[in-house]
């Protein structure tokens, strides 16, 4: 690492004074730690002669007086215009021995044949090198003159000086370098052999003294400073130089650091009633909550209070989360080989790359080796990594918040703080790092839900000063807690009761809280029927959009033994409106063309009224208007009756078809056989089943008893031809279904005239007849 050759003026090259410091003999250390000194040859002048001045100076036994030194320097400075060749004066140490240098002057001849007079303080070693005492080279620049150089033309070849590289940061700022100082504040340390390089005019180098607390933004490198490949006087000192420089790391979100020597919490005016968060770090390096959740009653009284975090350590954990929000900034001590992690689980960032041009003066001081060409430190998150950290609250208060940090030897370095810290009080963070290598890991969550870790490695950092964390003003965390949720529960008696469930809400500082009102009891509702004692009268109301209520009738599930003293009323089930108790269906005049033209009757006036379909080619005849209307809907394709069962949606032209279809969903079998108690969904299926019993017993039609009950205006007469309801006499004798009745002297006419006969229901249908 040499600088380019620069011309040296003759008036700037003065003769070096010899300072013997009161000694006539000098020691040269040569055990490998010998420090290199420099020598310069003064240009010769004819008037007065510099050799005469040197001979007069060296003839004295003691050190030269200050007056003589000044005279010699003045004489050398006025010797402009004279020409002379400088010999190859080289500085080197003889290894593994001490040499005694005599103070007598010497005159030797170099390789070019020039006569050079050596001062009394210097000597010639066995290798033919000139050695000058180190006391005479204080506060002088070190350079060497190669053999055969000519100073008359104003140039000096192979001048090597200032081996510190010129390093600048990304924004053009000057690099600040620091080196460990020698013990005696001299240019060369005799004990450690360190070479102290004199800085140039455009560099700022702290060359001596321990790192002072008054010097800001300076990083001191401990240990020996070795210059690699520096040639001084023909000798080389190989080694690797640790150059400490300011390298921009690229902390996003305008994050800077400012040092804090001590945190005086008493002068910050902190309150005594603040909440305390108790958190811990598990073995995986995640922040966990070790306290219990606070209920809503305590949160209402502690509105506006601050949160003080407390981070504890597990037995096997060497990782540390450094809190970065304004309410959790405390001094932290980080050991070498420890991992500094940022918990950003609550943030979603977009992967990207931050270039050096986007950095805004945020630096972390690192050490870069000479053998390392370039170290690109990249941050793969375009958005700020640290903005707001979600904190868990704990109900248990603590008097002190302590941050501890785990080390491989299970040694704990802790920094104590007082009982609470407000976010307005602490705005700074101090990171004290021991020498070594440490990692910075930032955890981010991608939009797809994957957790990624970004790792940054920094080597050789001993101390970080002038660092300040400033939180980004955007992206406040919004909490939407549910304060009270009312759940509906069904009691044993069927009543719906509301049970409020209280949920705790976290009152965190600087967070907007959105309150959700209480939810009323809705969803499942049980509607009680008129007769609460009968489970068959319970109506189940389905959720929207199904507004129709289903009623499970009790007579559809009763056995035949429960049908004694039953009054049977046959109604028109084909009507458009369902039957409601206490209301009668009004008959509507038929509006078909045949009924209007024929005056409402068929061709035969004495017979029952008939309704003939007026569609050409059909000609079907119906005895009821409802049947004709249903038939006309079949012609037009209109199907107004829709099954509202889930995922069904079938449509029908007649209501009885819809009711029959519903029984396929519910599995209801309302038609019961009186012989074997089998159940059927349809009445025609039951009629066919009854015929099987009749055929087995050989029942003839003459032994069948048909009866009618109370032939009133509201009841329909039941006859033997094409009737819809079959009644059997069960008063006298034993009757099994429709069978032979043993009346013991009672005629069939007497049975028919008896109006108090208990009846047994065999089949119920308004429009279906038995075959």
Swiss-Prot record:
It comes from the Eukaryota. It is found in: Nucleus; Nucleus, PML body. The modification N6-acetyllysine is found at residue 541. GO terms for biological process: B cell differentiation; definitive hemopoiesis; embryonic camera-type eye morphogenesis; embryonic skeletal system development; enucleate erythrocyte differentiation; granulocyte differentiation; liver development; lung development. Acetylated by histone acetyltransferase p300, deacetylated by HDACs. Acetylation/deacetylation states regulate transcriptional activity. Acetylation appears to activate transcription. Alternate sumoylation and acetylation at Lys-541 also control transcriptional activity. Residues 129-228, 341-489 are annotated as: Transactivation domain (Gln-rich). GO terms for molecular function: chromatin binding; DNA-binding transcription factor activity, RNA polymerase II-specific; DNA-binding transcription repressor activity, RNA polymerase II-specific; RNA polymerase II cis-regulatory region sequence-specific DNA binding; RNA polymerase II-specific DNA-binding transcription factor binding; zinc ion binding. Residues 1-47, 60-79 are annotated as: Disordered. It holds the Pfam family zf-C2H2. There is a cross-link at residues 109, 541 (Glycyl lysine isopeptide (Lys-Gly) (interchain with G-Cter in SUMO)). Residues 524-610 are annotated as: Repressor domain. Its main location: nucleus. A zinc finger (C2H2-type) spans 611-635, 641-665, 671-693. SUPFAM superfamilies: beta-beta-alpha zinc fingers (SSF57667). A motif (9aaTAD) lies at residues 451-459. Disulfide bonds: none annotated. One of its GO terms (cellular component) is transcription repressor complex. InterPro entries: Znf_C2H2_sf, Znf_C2H2_type. Residues 34-47 have a biased composition (Low complexity). Keywords: Acetylation, Activator, DNA-binding, Isopeptide bond, Metal-binding, Nucleus, Repeat, Transcription, Transcription regulation, Ubl conjugation, Zinc, Zinc-finger. Belongs to the Sp1 C2H2-type zinc-finger protein family. Transcriptional factor that can act as an activator or repressor depending on post-translational modifications. Binds to GT and GC boxes promoter elements. Competes with SP1 for the GC-box promoters. Weak activator of transcription. Required for activation of SPARC transcription. Interacts with HDAC1 and HDAC2; the interaction deacetylates SP3 and regulates its transcriptional activity. Interacts with v-Jun. The 9aaTAD motif is a transactivation domain present in a large number of yeast and animal transcription factors. This is Transcription factor Sp3. The gene is SP3.
